[in-house]
């Protein structure tokens, strides 16, 4: 009977909640923000825990006393504390000289302890975000080891790892609190343009390499995972104001409140305005037949409508000196809206049903205007983005259920390149323009050219005449420049007489007619003769995961289902005439891990099976071993894999750009002819055309990409003060997705009409060659005294196989790059110890490389170096009996204003200096 009563009493006690409150400070009694406080069960870290707020405070609701907790924070030695009652406890951490405050190697998703990670993951914590010298935390990610950042515009930054960089980062996955942040229609994230505000970010992890096993088929080349602040742990009001060059104005406010022990909420508002960098590269494209010296013009990188050229049609003596001539194009700066605007509104409601189960509703709204570069340059104007998330999870991480939806609206977005073409064709069609140009040259310029003293003899053969004529042009370049300028003016004036309205003004930037025509084209859909695209696509996603802890190891199982509902009204996809497109995909995964040799050795195996409705199931296995040789050295080895399903564009695209139709390729494509073959045919005399072989070829249906990666790593502490992390990887890629350009033709039966019709297509396709890459990276971090630290990292990435397959996408990655940084944190100013000084400088060097985008945007990026710097002052105030911390900061990205191209076809990126104030 006594045993029964005792059991009843113990069970009753277990039901009582124990509230623990405390604070974490450093050796100078300054609060430590974002410190981890975790409960130990049987001497091992559990998932029960919290983090400290901006005052270093924390609280936990447990079942009973006593309880042991472990407190840790980057840059400090961990400490374990036994708590026996509910009294508030102060835990003091001492600085750890072996860990840099800003960049750390954090745990891979399957592991429980930092020192036993299976992969190298670059990370930024809340303090590193606050102290970043870059204009935003997202920009600062480009200084991390092995991470590449590309700026297509102020509003659109791209993060990539391990090669095959692109301004359409379809091979990287971006998560915010576990939610895919991609645009449903584009199938990739627009940087952080539609992401989370800086004030609400508690940490950012960049996981390099193939990571499909637990993150899904989009995690092909890496994962950017952002974690936002828990409203139970980070309460109060925070705000920031930033002003800077290029009329930068940024305002952000975060309000979070813990209403009671069960309910908490947060609201974030972010607004940004700036004048974007203008893309004004007027050098000739790599595919231009002529350079800047040609009197008849050339195809410039950021001038559109000047791509096509004409010549004398073989009659070089009838049109002497004409050469190749191009229609004057329209510069991008007259076509694109460079007034960048960005608004973000996020909110989250958290409810604890009990001590173990939490429910979450979260909403993420983004809107604005920016510039995106894909096959063309696009003005993303008035775009809207809305995510809604419902989540139910077990607080110790044993299970979760998550469902979310993402909706987008392209607003008034349009294709800048195609706008120029549509404007020209709506006023004067190209064929009419070229015919009149030749005619005017013959009438007005032929006599002047023939009167030149060094004019060649008409008795020469055509080839010899043309060769000598080229020398005449070179000797009289200014004269021929003037002739071409005059000819274009005559042609346009003639057109005005024919059409009866001001043709010149409609194509002359700055005139009312130009603005009227541009407004008409950009406000009309592609299907209506304009350049605006319609996109109200959406995706719906559900997923769940369960963890099992057994003597045989820890097991995880999970799965997800996703539905894409593209809706472009025929302006992007083949959803015209009432056609409804739906795309379904799903996956299941499982993982196991176990510790051996007193937890010095950890082995793990994972596998994921994915199925898209249009493709066969694909398996993505992974395995790793991590061995802690001693307190200062940890070795790791992993073999991982990933797949990437073709995007909606790869499957369903139907995008008519006038001179070609861009197609998805679900079913294959047959009987195409290469463009080179058609050019060869046109160069033959009539008799030979009848026997010409067009060499028809077929394209197989699109299929998913695959990659396998082997990686080894070493992490160590040297001389008790230098922290080292190094890794080497080798990757093998198959079935890379690119495109093939070909033409559908209709043949006639005679030499005259043998080639009756031609339609050019660009079709999504898989490469047939296997591609291998390898790379190495190393990071070094150390402290200098109590307040200063040095960091440095180096990365080497190499495309190792000799690839001749034109479908293989460009590597677009510098072979060598490095960063060197110095930081000063919380240095107390003499006589005013309540004021703390911070500073940081980072130098980044990137070796030049070939950037291959669309044919218009392919060219060399020169080597460059950039310096980011900041200086901050933090002071505590007592306002209405409330401690308020204010940080004043001055900083600059690219402080030396070294204007560089980071992407070919993009703008020259210069300095962006700023002043900011943040209040907590």
Where are these regions (language model features)?
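Extracytoplasmic beta-strand/coil segments of soluble accessory domains associated
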Residues: 121, 138-180, 203
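Membrane-embedded beta-barrel scaffold of Gram-negative outer-membrane proteins
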Residues: 668-760
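Short acidic/polar hinge/loop motifs at secondary-structure boundaries
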Residues: 58-61, 180-208
């Amino acid at each position: 009977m006594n045993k029964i009563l005792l059991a009843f009493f113990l069970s009753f006690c277990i039901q009582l909640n124990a509230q623990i409150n405390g604070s974490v400070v450093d050796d100078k009694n300054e609060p430590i923000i974002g410190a981890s406080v975790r409960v130990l069960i049987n001497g091992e870290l559990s998932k029960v825990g919290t983090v400290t707020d901006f005052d270093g405070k924390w609280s936990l609701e447990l079942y009973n006393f006593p309880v042991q907790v472990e407190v840790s924070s980057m840059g400090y030695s961990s400490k374990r504390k036994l708590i026996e009652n509910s009294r508030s406890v102060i835990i003091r951490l001492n600085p750890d000289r072996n860990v840099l405050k800003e960049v750390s190697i954090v745990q891979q998703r399957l592991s429980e302890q930092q020192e036993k990670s299976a992969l190298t993951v670059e990370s930024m914590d809340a303090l590193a975000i606050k102290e970043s010298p870059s204009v935003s935390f997202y920009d600062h990610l480009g200084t991390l080891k092995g991470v590449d950042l590309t700026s297509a515009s102020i509003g659109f930054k791209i993060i990539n790892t391990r090669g095959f960089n692109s301004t359409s980062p379809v091979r990287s996955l971006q998560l915010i609190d576990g939610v895919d942040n991609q645009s449903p229609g584009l199938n990739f994230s627009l940087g952080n343009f539609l992401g989370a505000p800086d004030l609400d970010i508690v940490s950012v992890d960049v996981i390099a390499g193939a990571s499909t096993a637990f993150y899904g088929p989009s995690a092909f080349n890496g994962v950017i995972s952002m974690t936002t602040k828990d409203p139970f742990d980070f309460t109060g009001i925070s705000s920031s104001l930033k002003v800077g060059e290029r009329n930068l104005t940024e305002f952000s406010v975060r309000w979070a409140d813990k209403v009671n022990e069960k309910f908490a909420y947060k609201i974030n508002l972010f607004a940004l305005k700036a004048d974007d960098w203008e893309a004004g590269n007027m050098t000739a494209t790599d595919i231009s037949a002529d350079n800047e010296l040609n009197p008849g013009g050339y195809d410039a990188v950021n001038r559109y409508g000047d791509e096509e050229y004409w010549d004398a049609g073989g009659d070089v003596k009838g049109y002497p000196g004409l050469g190749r001539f191009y229609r004057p194009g329209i510069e991008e700066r007259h076509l694109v809206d460079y007034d960048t605007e960005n608004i973000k509104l996020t909110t989250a409601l958290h409810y604890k049903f009990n001590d173990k189960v939490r429910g979450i509703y979260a909403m993420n709204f983004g809107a604005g205007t920016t510039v995106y570069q894909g096959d063309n340059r696009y003005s993303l104007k008035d775009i809207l983005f809305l995510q809604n998330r419902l989540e139910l999870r077990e607080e110790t991480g044993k299970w979760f259920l998550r469902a979310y939806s993402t909706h987008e609206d392209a607003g008034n977005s349009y294709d800048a390149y195609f706008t120029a073409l549509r404007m020209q064709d709506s006023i004067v069609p190209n064929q009419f323009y070229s015919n009149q140009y030749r005619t005017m040259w013959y009438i007005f310029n032929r006599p002047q050219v023939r009167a030149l003293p060094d004019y060649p003899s008409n008795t020469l053969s055509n080839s010899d005449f043309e060769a000598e004529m080229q020398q005449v042009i070179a000797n009289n370049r200014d004269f021929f420049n003037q002739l071409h300028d005059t000819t274009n003016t005559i042609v346009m004036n003639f057109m005005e007489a024919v059409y009866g309205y001001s043709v010149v003004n409609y194509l002359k930037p700055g005139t009312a007619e130009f603005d009227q025509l541009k407004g008409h084209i950009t406000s009309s859909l592609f299907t209506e003769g304009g350049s605006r695209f319609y996109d109200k696509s959406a995706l719906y996603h559900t997923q769940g995961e369960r963890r099992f802890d057994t003597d045989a190891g820890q097991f995880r199982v999970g799965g997800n289902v996703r539905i894409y509902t593209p809706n472009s009204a025929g302006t992007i996809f083949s959803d015209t005439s009432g056609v409804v497109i739906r795309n379904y995909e799903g996956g299941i995964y499982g993982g196991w891990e176990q510790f051996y040799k007193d937890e010095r050795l950890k082995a793990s195996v994972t596998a994921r099976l994915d199925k898209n409705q249009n493709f066969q199931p694909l398996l993505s296995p992974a395995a790793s071993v991590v061995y802690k040789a001693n307190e200062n050295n940890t070795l790791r080895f992993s073999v991982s894999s990933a797949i990437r399903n073709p995007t909606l564009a790869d499957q369903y695209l139907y995008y008519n750009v006038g001179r070609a139709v861009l197609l998805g390729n679900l079913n294959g494509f047959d009987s195409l002819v290469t463009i080179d073959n058609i050019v060869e045919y046109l160069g033959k005399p009539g008799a030979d055309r009848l026997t010409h072989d067009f060499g028809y070829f077929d394209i197989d249906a699109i299929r998913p990409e695959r990659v396998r990666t082997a990686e080894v790593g070493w992490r160590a502490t040297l001389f008790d003060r230098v922290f080292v992390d190094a890794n080497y990887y080798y990757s093998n890629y198959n079935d890379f997705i690119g495109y093939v350009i070909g033409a559908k033709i209709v043949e006639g039966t005679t030499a005259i009409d043998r080639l009756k019709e031609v339609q050019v297509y660009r079709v999504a396709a898989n490469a047939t060659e296997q591609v291998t890459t390898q790379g190495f990276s190393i990071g070094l971090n150390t402290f200098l005294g109590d307040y200063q630290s040095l960091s440095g990292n180096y990365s080497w990435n190499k495309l190792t196989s000799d690839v001749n397959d034109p479908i293989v996408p460009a590597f677009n990655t510098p072979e060598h790059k490095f960063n060197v940084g110095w930081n000063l944190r919380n240095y107390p100013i003499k006589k005013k110890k309540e004021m703390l000084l911070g500073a940081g400088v980072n130098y980044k060097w990137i070796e030049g490389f070939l950037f291959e985008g669309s044919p218009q945007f392919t060219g060399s990026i020169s080597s460059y170096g950039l310096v980011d710097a900041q200086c901050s002052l933090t002071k505590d105030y007592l306002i209405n009996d409330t401690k308020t911390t204010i940080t004043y900061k001055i900083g600059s990205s690219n402080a030396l204003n070294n204007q560089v191209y980071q992407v070919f076809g993009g703008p020259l990126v210069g300095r962006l200096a700023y002043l900011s104030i943040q209040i907590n």
